[in-house]
Structure formats: structure tokens, C-alpha cells
Amino acid sequence: MSKARLLFGSMFLALAVLLSSSAIAQPATHLLPKVAKVTVNSPVTLTDNGDSWTLDNGIVKMTVLKRNGNLSSLVYHGIEVLTRGEYWEQMPSGTVTARVTIDPATNGGERAEVSVLGVNPGDRNNPSPLGGPPGGGVPAAQEPRFPAAAPAAGAAGPRGPGGPGGAAGARPPAGPRGGGMDIETRYTLERGTSGFYTYAEYTHKASYPPAGEGESRFILESMNRTFDWLSVDKDRNQLMTSDDDLRKGVVIHAKEQRILTSGVYANSVEHKYSYNALMYKLQAWGWSSTKDKIGVYFVNPSNEYIGGGPEKLDLIDHMSGTLLDYWTSGHYGGGAGNHIPAGEDWKHVVGPIFVYFNALADGKDASQADLDKLAATSGSGAPAVPQVWRDNQLALWNDAVEKSKAVKAAWPYAWVSGVDYPHKDGRATVTGQLVLDDPDAPQAAGKTFPHLTIGLAHPDYINPSGGFQQRAGNGNVVTWPHDGNYYQFWTDGSSDGRFTIANVRPGTYTLHAFADGVLGEYAKVNITVEAGKPLNLGKLDWQPVRYGKQIWEIGYPDRTADKFFKGDGDNYWLWGWGLRYSGLFPNDITYTIDKSDYRKDWFFQEVPHSDTEAWKNPAAKDPYNQRFGWVALPTGTKDPWPEWGHGRATTWTVKFNMPKTSKGTAVLRVALAGADGGNGTDPSVAGNLSIGLNGQTVGTIHTIATNALRYNTNKGVWNQYIQKFDASLLKPGENEMTFTVPAGDVTTGVVWDYLRLELNDGSKAYATPPDNQRPDYPTLE
């Protein structure tokens, strides 16, 4: 049994402990400051200003423009939060109607709500005046990239949800470009609540031409400069680069990446995509102020309206105090926009989203000695950020996370009316139990689920426009990771496979499940949910696909690279691992089954091998590992990427022993958490992965770009690839399997999840899963 398998149990135990613990980081040695309790309970007032409304509850005061539904002012604690605006990316257009949907005069000041509706049966939607793309289309920098034609014989195609590699085709227009879409945006303010709700309803009538959004989000843009601390999760909770230092930085590789030449993080690279997040796991995220000791945070009370399901990773902020809440986008290859054809009646309600404000009751100020120490250590790689700042901002974020739990627990909201939003009695709860049936698994695997994710999604369908889903590698077939059109309902199951999916809208769905330690996916079609009728699916047998006896494995399948070296939350999001890889593994990787440890001997991404170290900051103590201060700009101010950013081909070797001559078919199963650059059939194209065995090439994986490397993450849209070869190529004794990434840009290559070699020698028949489960959607050809 391999060492990787022996480590399997202990790693899962650690993972289970982590998942069961609170996401809120708590210092062990001292108490955090207290967050001020809300004591104001004034009635909500609504003032009509002619071209706008002002909503005020004595805690939050906001002004909504009638012409487009944007916020022009947002005041908390006497501080104007906005310097540019807060808005939905696609604004109401066409025939615009502004109205009061909840008048506080009719409910004793308990709640006020205003609405701006744009009816647009055929004109392209107005672009945002603050920078949104015309008609919600995709900016040029985010236009989808397409996979090449289906792999030739002997090449491995993607085997994740959605099937074989997409077919080649011409690029369709980005965004609706003249399509019709009615958009209504609403803002709601309650008595005694330190925050407000906002939501939008998108409507496409059957008579409208095709329409859609390449990306869509709610944005709080360019807040007051007082907001200088970003909180995403326990690992990314920090003082941020100032506007001035960001402007002074030198662009490297892409406009959103800059080498900082001044400030706290001088000699580091700042990149907005370092602050991406898995939307399904995100609790509360936002900015706070070390000066004014206030915070503002976004909360999604539900994930039902977010495209891409629980695997959707997205950008949640821009630099300079901007908050983002994407409900659909092409980032990382998932939930890639929505595309509504002519003839379809379609509605989609996004939100209500909650925007939360808080303030400290007893926060402390940094001393002059603290500030002097910070100044003295700026640019060193270990800036001495004052502990009082850490405590203050952590207290604010902890409070926001606690608030998010209450906001989520109250979903769905009884006060929402007039849009396509069923209340509690118009929804249903779906329950059941998945039973793992994997008789061919190594004995140590067990029958419990360390982490099970299960959900209901729209049945697979053919994408009418063919663009964004092709980027994700499944042609025009849209499956849940790539669906931005329809609602999805997901939950975490228990270790024994039991699950409860609450608040499901009526409809017909496919049930999907995936779990740590189980390669592939469970799916059951034709699940019909009726309003107010609980649905118990009973016990559901899940027999994962196996093509033969397991010979070895590296890692364990969990759709991320976090189990591998540097793939964890302390590291993966930092820009520059493509440059630093060659210093960490100067001779690349040789991994020996039964001896090597994937946690330290297998890097989380395989990229071209750079032979330059011109990027190293000579003052850095550990340039290959430290978070900040590891890079130095060469003389001049031009982008150094042409000199730094190219690497030669990289080959990793896996050594393993076979006891005797083999016969039959060997099947290599490669699960990739992400990839970049491999949208071609030519194995020399950067990003593709060539596989060799004992000096002979056995195939090439033509990967599908997800921007996981370029955009600093340990996962994109997950794909599994199958490579068959004649088992006679395996020899008695030591064998060497190689994985080669071609020369190219060091942000191309693959992000690893899991590898497994199986052998079918014909001595046993391996059952084909039932059609209605399709754990590994495509069949093995």
C-alpha cells in the first residue's frame, strides 16, 4: 500500500477537524475589542427628493437615484462611505419606472423599500456609467478562450462533469449585444438594522431576442480612503496597499499586477486576484478602517442565485476599497455568464444581498512607537503591522461573520414581494442518504464521507450561444459548474451520507454529489420538487467508477490543490509561484511511490522551469518562501516579464514498482484542480501535459484554461482526464512515469488535485454505473 494511501486517513481526520471548527480566527492570549451594540431604534424615514430618494433609519442613511437605481450617497457613523458609487453592473434601461414598493408610513416605520425598473424589450442594456461593459458584455481582457477540436486518438480528453473536450468553433459575440432584458433593482432599509438589503430581478420574455450577461455583480466602488483593511478569510485578513503605493507600482505581466516600489509591502507584487474566494464557503467579506474603526461587509444570505454552484470561485474586491458580489462570471471557468435564447420566459432574482456596517466600542489606537516600527520594517518582507490594528479589524470581521449566520438563517425573507421569490411555504425540503458502494477501493478508504457536498441543479442543457461553456471545456453542454442561468441548491452532507437541502424552489432538477476521497461525481436525474411538499429520496447507492485495480495514487481527490506543498491557504494566493518554483525544486520533482510524501514532495502546480533569478530581492531572507518583500525591480520602470516570465519544459517523474509482467489495459486518471494555457491539440503548446512511461510517450492531456495559475488560486473548474495505454508497457520492477509541461510562460501549466493508476488485467469485470447516476459523465472510449 502506498504512503499516499497511508496518509489518507490522517489527512482526512485533520480536514474534518478543520471543517468543524469556526472560521473565525481568535487570538489565544488576549481578548479582542468589543463591537458597539446597535441601540438606535428610530423609525425608518423615506424622503422624496425629486430625482432621488433618501432612506434613513438613524444608523444608515442612503440616497438612491431614480434614473438608474444607483446609490449616490451612503452614510454610516457620520462618514460618507462612497466616493464614486454603489450599483448593479447592468442597470435598468429602456422605459424606466421608479416607485416606492414598501412605504414606511404604512408599517410604523419598520421598513422602507424603493424600486427602479427598466423595461427593455430589444434595446441593448445601458452600460454602467462607472465602468461596466456595454450590455453586460465581457470586457476584452475577460473574453472567453476556446478549446481546440476534440482530442485525437490516444489523447486524453477532460472527464469531469460535462463530458469530452469542446468542439472548435468561431467566437460568438460577447454579451447580449442588442438583446432584451428587463431589470429591476431594489433597496430595503429596516428599523434598528445596521445595514441594508439590495436585490435585482432580471426578466427575459419569450418575445425578446436572445440576451444575457457575460458577467454581473453588485458593486460598492471606491469607498472613502479610510477603509484600508481587507477581510476575506482567516488567512487573508490584512492591512492593504495604499492607493498611492499602488499607483507608483510597476505593471508586471498584466495591468492588474504591480511590483510595489514603496510603502508597507514594497518589494512585493500586488494583484487583485489574490483575493478571490469560493462563494459557497464565503461568510462575510469586506473592508474596515484602522483609523475610524468601522467596517462594511457583504453577505450572501443564500447561494441559490449564484452561477457555478459550490465550486464557483470569484473575485470579491478590487484595490482601493471596492467590494464585489458576482452572481455570474467567467472567472476561473465556472458559472460562465448566462445566455437566454429567444422564445424562453426567464426570471432570475439575485439577492436580497445584505450590506452590513459595524463599529468598535472600545478599539485602541496604534501608538507612535507602533507606527515607527511599522515604518522601519516596511518593505522588509515582515512588516510590523500594529497588533492593535489586527485585533480591531479581527473583532469587526468576527462580528460580521456572526451577523452573516443570522442573516442566512432567516432566508427566505417574508417581506420580499412583487418579484419571482417564493416564501417558505412556496418552497420544499429535500432529504436523503447517499450510501458509498466502492468495493474495489483500498481497505483504508472506508465508507464514510469526510466531506460531502450535495445539491440540486437545473438539468443539463445545450447552451444556445456556445461561448463561455466551451471555455470550461464541455462544448455546448451546460452542467452545474458552468451554469449561470438557473438556480442551484447545495448543502454539506454528514459523514454517513445524510443530507437536507432546504428552501428549494419548485422545479425539476438533477441531484449531484461529490466528496473528498471519492473520484468522480454522483448524479441522479428527474428530481421533481413541489411547493410545500417535503421530498425524501431515501437511500441512494453511489458506486464510484473504477476501471481496474488501483496500483497507486498521489494525494486524494478533493477538487483543490491544498493538500500539496504550497497549495494551502497560507500560500496559494500569493502571486509569483511560477517564478519561485525553480528555486524550491531546482531539479524538478522525482516522486517515489511508498517513499515520498505528497504534502512536501509534490508542488501544487506544475509550470515551465524558469532559469532566471533576476527577480530576487537580495535583501530578502527567504525569497522562495516569504510572503512579502521577495522581489526586486530591475533598473528602470518597464515591465520585466519579457525577461523573467519564460521557462523551459518541466518534467516530473513518478517512480513505482510492479511485481510482474502486466497484461490488459492500464488507466491513468488525472484530476486537475485547474490549468492554464492548454487550449491546443499540439503537445508543445504551453499548458498541455504530456505523459510518458519508461521513455515512451503514451498520450497528451489537452487541458482547458481556467486561469487558476494566472489568477493565483489552488483551484479553478475541476476536470478529470483519462489516459489509457497497453499494460504491457509496464515492466516488472521499477517503472518511471513522466509528466511534462512544455516551455512557455510560467503562469501556464496545471494545478494538481489527484493522480491514480488503475490496471484492468481482464480477471474481473468492472461494472458500468447506471445511466441515471453518471458519476463520470462521459464513457471510457
Question: Which ranges hold each PLM region?
Answer:
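A contiguous, surface-exposed recognition patch within enzymatic or periplasmic domains that forms
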Residues: L220-H348
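Extended, loop-rich substrate-binding clefts of extracytoplasmic carbohydrate-active enzymes
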Residues: T47, Y87-A156, G162-S207
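Beta-strand-rich ligand-recognition modules
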Residues: D496, K638-K663, A671-P778
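A short, solvent-exposed beta-strand micro-motif common in secreted/extracellular proteins
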Residues: G497, G507-V518
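A short, amphipathic beta-strand motif
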Residues: A428-P439, G497, L540
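Beta-strand-rich N-terminal accessory domains
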Residues: P27-W88, R171, R177
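Structured interaction patches on ligand/partner-binding surfaces of diverse proteins
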Residues: D516-V545
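Short, acidic Ser/Thr/Gly-rich low-complexity loop/linker segments typical of extracellular
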Residues: Y461-R498
